Design a protein with these regions (language model features):
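Phosphate-group recognition and catalysis centered on beta-loop-alpha active-site segments
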Residues: 1-143
Length: 143
């Protein structure tokens, strides 16, 4: 199962650390985990991480080198969504809004499944504020 840390959270939401580049580095390298980040790009050169607003300045080099540390992705995987039930990512994953179910196995990612007790069996992966809950022997697993 693909396990994705939502904004760098590991054991619950922590707004003081969300989208913080140093914290994200610790998650990607230390835990070998993918991280979903909120990226703002202005004039194709200025880049920032942050949820409700641009907060942490980064550059393309930071973004590019981190993708090499992600255990699954070998290129950027990006998407945009608001409250749509499903969004297709650039790498063909189905990004499922919290509470949206799928019934056949697919390349779908359950977002925040803990909010609605989503049945995870048909999903390829999850994006959560609680990735530690899904680790068994340091491997992502459905518990």
């Amino acid at each position: 199962m693909l396990l994705i840390s939502h904004r760098g959270n590991v054991s619950g939401s922590d707004p003081s650390l969300e989208n913080n580049p140093d914290h994200i580095d610790r998650i990607i390298v230390g835990m070998e985990m993918n991280v979903e980040i909120d990226l703002y790009v202005f004039d194709q050169q200025e880049m920032y991480l942050g949820h409700d607003q641009p907060q942490y300045g980064i550059d393309f080099k930071w973004l590019y080198t981190r993708r090499n540390n992600c255990p699954v992705n070998d290129h950027f995987n990006y998407f945009w969504h608001q409250i749509d039930n499903f969004t297709l990512t650039s790498k063909g994953y189905i990004w499922a809004y919290p509470g949206c179910e799928i019934h056949l196995p697919s390349r779908a990612i359950a977002v925040m499944p803990e909010e609605s007790k989503t049945n995870l069996r048909p999903f390829y992966g999850i994006c959560t504020d609680y990735p530690e809950r899904y680790l068994v022997n340091d491997k992502a697993s459905i518990i």
